Amino acid sequence: GDGKEADNRHTKNFIKKLSEVDKNGNALIDLVLVILDGGSRDLGTSYELINKVIISNFGQGKENRILVAIHQANMAMKGRNWDYAKNEPNQRLVNFLEEKVRSVRDRVYEATGVIVEPIYYSAGYKGWGEQSRPYNLSKLLYYIVKAIPSEKRAIRVPWFYRCMS
């Protein structure tokens, strides 16, 4: 979005960072979390980044190291079909979000052969007297922790995994 020259520079930096390894040859980057805008219809640039930059340059085990999250689930249909009292999508919005998940999964798989399992969430907000609670944020955190190699986790909380199963 910053122009062709800046996009090329960012792409080279991504590839360089994804290729970095430690002294034992292990990748320094364990996980890439790609956050897509739930309200956007044009995800072409995002697919190009996922398919041509991240997946193409991520090395071994990429299937388990790429997470895709669709942010602003509450705004995916411009704020319609969100039950603000229950802080959750109604069935029409769930269907819309599930279709977006399926579309992202299928487009990535068709282009790369890599299976990703996108999730949707809303981070919530607070300000100027308004407030919205997070939705599916703990699920996103669970997916992140689950995807990080256990030996690199700073903390191991067995109850967290039991409650998320």
Report each predicted region and the residues it spans:
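Conserved GTPase G-domain substructure that encodes guanine base recognition and part of the catalytic core
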Residues: 3-165
